[in-house]
Design a protein with these regions (language model features):
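C-terminal capping alpha-helices of c-type cytochrome domains
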Residues: 4-7, 12-14, 87, 108-110, ...
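Active-site phosphate-binding and catalytic loops of NTP-dependent enzymes
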Residues: 92-96
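Gly/Gly-Pro-rich "capping" loops immediately C-terminal to redox-active cysteine motifs
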Residues: 61-87, 98-144, 149
Length: 181
């Protein structure tokens, strides 16, 4: 049907310019030993930086975000996996965080993460934090997307910045850094 559109909202940090050079796992790994925790923390929490905290929480006392809770994920993650997740978030999407695309019988398209499903409705959490409840009887099409709503940072962060964010995240496991701004 020509009236339906398929799109996916991917959040892009506002303050980061697109880089000419692509950051790769290979370019980041040698820099991890010199990753700066303070710079990584600033990038993680800053709205003008990577802004990871907009979607991810690092402490179970913080309210849940749009993205996976990093306080539990980091317990089993190695630095290479963290770097890969930053540069290519679609490589491995945590269960429950794949975007859903739902087309309703009025031709409207809705995207979000499925946060609740009953016999009669679906509830999608959208990137802006709003929840949309859709009656199942109105759903024409529902597709689980193979894309992450998280932007790829391969052209948004330099290898050194990725190393800094990774150093900050890895430090949370050992308690070396504060989990809060």
């Amino acid at each position: 049907d020509g009236n339906k559109s398929n799109f996916l909202v991917i959040i892009r940090p506002a303050g980061l310019p697109r880089l000419a050079e692509v950051s790769t796992v290979k370019s980041v790994l040698p820099l991890l030993a010199n990753g700066q925790l303070d710079r990584g923390k600033a990038l993680f929490f800053s709205k003008g930086g990577a802004g990871c905290s907009k979607c991810h929480r690092t402490d179970t006392t913080q309210p849940p975000g749009f993205g996976p809770d990093l306080s539990s994920l980091l317990k089993q993650a190695d630095p290479r996996k963290v770097v890969t997740s930053i540069l290519d978030p679609g490589a491995e999407i945590k269960e429950g965080f794949a975007m859903q695309l739902v087309v309703t019988d009025d031709g409207k398209t809705h995207t979000g993460i499925l946060v609740d499903e009953t016999g009669s409705s679906l509830t999608l959490l959208q990137p802006d934090g709003r929840k949309v409840v859709l009656p199942k009887k109105m759903v024409d099409e529902r597709v689980s997307q193979k894309l992450s709503p998280m932007p790829s940072f391969e052209r948004l962060l330099t290898p050194a910045q990725v190393a800094d964010v990774t150093a900050y995240l890895m430090s949370l496991r050992s308690g070396k850094a504060s989990r809060r701004r």
